[in-house]
Amino acid sequence: YEARPSFTFEKAVDTYNHLLSAAEAATWTLSEIEEHAASKEEPQGELGIAYASLRHREWLSWQERRMQQRNKWREFFESFDVVLLPVTLTEAIRHDHSSPFTGRTVQVDEQKRPYTDQLKWVGLTGVSWLPSTVVPVGQIDSKPVGVQIAGPFLEDRTTLAAGRFLQEALGGFQRPHGF
């Protein structure tokens, strides 16, 4: 059974990336914003400085896109209580604290991907302000794997209840070997 809202994953993630970068830029000085706006550097991992220098008019356009996606999620949840989604692209990984953030990579199926790709699935729901609950559902090579349970706006208890049901069905949390 495939349940999907009536917008593309790519469109939702693009909206998330633009709005997240613009929000991060709120802590920058005016000279930093101007420097980034003048930069010809392309966004790295679909998330980068080029998005951070949005003009207010552009930001409003991205906000409108967010609201349209929220409406499509609302329509989706008229037929479904929750939706199950990945949390990230892989099982749990060792955290990388090297700098810069946009230069980090993660290995996915023997291919290096931008570290920021790990944000895509939480961005899909987060950009529309949907509650989500993450529960462990198994392990790969002794590393935990989780599932994201997303639900309608302001229905946090729905996702928590679904998480409890799923945990009961799967036998609860199993501590990975070595932890």
Residue ranges and their predicted role:
Residues 87:
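Glycine-rich, N-terminal phosphate-binding loop of Rossmann-like dinucleotide-binding domains
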